Amino acid sequence: MSHAIDELQAIIAELKVELEEQKTSNRQARSRIDRMSAEVVDSNPYSRLMALQRMNIVKEYERIRDKAVAVVGVGGVGSVTADMLTRCGIGKLILFDYDKVELANMNRLFFTPDQAGLSKVEAAARTLNFINPDVQIETHNYNITTVDNFDRFLATITESGKELGQPVDLVLSCVDNFEARMAINAACNERNLNWFESGVSENAVSGHIQFIRPGDTACFACAPPLVVAENIDEKTLKREGVCAASLPTTMGITAGFLVQNALKYLLNFGEVSDYLGYNALNDFFPRMTLKPNPQCDDRNCLLRQKEFQARPKPIEVKEDVSSSDEPLHATNEWGIELVADDEPVNCPEPAKSSAVVQGLKLAYEAPEKEKVEEENVATVSDETSLEDLMAQMKSM
């Protein structure tokens, strides 16, 4: 009986795939674009992105086509992350997830009800290919925490970059459990790959991203949550009938922070946050840098720490400003002039009632400066001490 049910479920899944393919084929996708252009026309999907060059934010934005990013977990944060990277024109996107789309996922962004039952990576790939056919999308539908699949995951992020045989440029962790985070952490420490860890709290009102550079900053095992440190099984913490809360707003904000910092890292602009948190209750955004733990349990992390400490530190060269005869500003576009401290200040004359519009009268008129000075001089000259007055009275 159970075997027959499994067969029926497999048939239903195949029919859903065929139906999805039929719907996709009816939609007309745009043709591929060989080269990014800054031309401002309605038919150019990259004109707004290339405008970052004209505004001196990014140099050579089209370099993004040479980058490969792996997104692990295509859920509330991961699906939006993949969507943003696709719209930004990333060169290659590698998706990892083994879950299926459910109607319970509809409170999040990206997925649609007609995709229920499809694998998340498959549903995401079809939508993303339609959004931007220029992006090369690769999908992997398996659990990376098993022994065999971990080796497959390790090989993929090491050899499936934009150029085959090269590692990916960045790994983005968008998973919702500590076991998967530890697997990503172990893989990136072993292969010395930079990666971002992200997450949203179970009450859905806070999130964070963390940029991990092996050896330079703390890895996920350097300062693990209590659940990981105590080797507690996460499944035992979940009560029956109780699930984590989820808000598309918090998911979208966290994904936005994640992709924003990923772009800054990939295209070398701005400052990449080592850790950025978000608390929705009071709109609090803490930033910090976590240093690696010299007693970390991950041996590869300890190895990366030694390698980082052995690197020669960059020498800071201070420029000798005094030796330059050229002015600091060759041109003075705004006509700014420096005024000496001892130069008299020209104060504007106070307004008079006669100078205002007819029918209006000033509530207070400042006295003329000459009269004020004369009154002050007269007051000073009339002042006599008490001793002098008593001496004058005695002499009378």
UniProtKB/Swiss-Prot annotation:
<dbReference type="InterPro" id="IPR045886">
    <property type="entry name" value="ThiF/MoeB/HesA"/>
</dbReference>
<feature type="binding site">
    <location>
        <position position="76"/>
    </location>
    <ligand>
        <name>ATP</name>
    </ligand>
</feature>
<keyword id="KW-0067">ATP-binding</keyword>
<dbReference type="GO" id="GO:0046872">
    <property type="term" value="F:metal ion binding"/>
</dbReference>
<dbReference type="Pfam" id="PF00899">
    <property type="entry name" value="ThiF"/>
</dbReference>
<feature type="binding site">
    <location>
        <position position="301"/>
    </location>
    <ligand>
        <name>Zn(2+)</name>
    </ligand>
</feature>
<dbReference type="InterPro" id="IPR000594">
    <property type="entry name" value="ThiF_NAD_FAD-bd"/>
</dbReference>
<feature type="binding site">
    <location>
        <position position="296"/>
    </location>
    <ligand>
        <name>Zn(2+)</name>
    </ligand>
</feature>
<keyword id="KW-0479">Metal-binding</keyword>
<feature type="binding site">
    <location>
        <position position="177"/>
    </location>
    <ligand>
        <name>ATP</name>
    </ligand>
</feature>
<keyword id="KW-0547">Nucleotide-binding</keyword>
<dbReference type="InterPro" id="IPR029752">
    <property type="entry name" value="D-isomer_DH_CS1"/>
</dbReference>
<feature type="active site" description="Glycyl thioester intermediate">
    <location>
        <position position="243"/>
    </location>
</feature>
<dbReference type="GO" id="GO:0071566">
    <property type="term" value="F:UFM1 activating enzyme activity"/>
</dbReference>
<feature type="binding site">
    <location>
        <position position="219"/>
    </location>
    <ligand>
        <name>Zn(2+)</name>
    </ligand>
</feature>
<dbReference type="GO" id="GO:0005524">
    <property type="term" value="F:ATP binding"/>
</dbReference>
<keyword id="KW-0833">Ubl conjugation pathway</keyword>
<feature type="binding site">
    <location>
        <position position="143"/>
    </location>
    <ligand>
        <name>ATP</name>
    </ligand>
</feature>
<keyword id="KW-0862">Zinc</keyword>
<comment type="function">
    <text>E1-like enzyme which activates UFM1.</text>
</comment>
<dbReference type="GO" id="GO:0005829">
    <property type="term" value="C:cytosol"/>
</dbReference>
<dbReference type="InterPro" id="IPR035985">
    <property type="entry name" value="Ubiquitin-activating_enz"/>
</dbReference>
<comment type="similarity">
    <text>Belongs to the ubiquitin-activating E1 family. UBA5 subfamily.</text>
</comment>
<feature type="binding site">
    <location>
        <position position="97"/>
    </location>
    <ligand>
        <name>ATP</name>
    </ligand>
</feature>
<dbReference type="GO" id="GO:0071569">
    <property type="term" value="P:protein ufmylation"/>
</dbReference>
<protein>
    <recommendedName>
        <fullName>Ubiquitin-like modifier-activating enzyme 5</fullName>
    </recommendedName>
</protein>
<feature type="binding site">
    <location>
        <position position="222"/>
    </location>
    <ligand>
        <name>Zn(2+)</name>
    </ligand>
</feature>
<feature type="binding site">
    <location>
        <position position="120"/>
    </location>
    <ligand>
        <name>ATP</name>
    </ligand>
</feature>
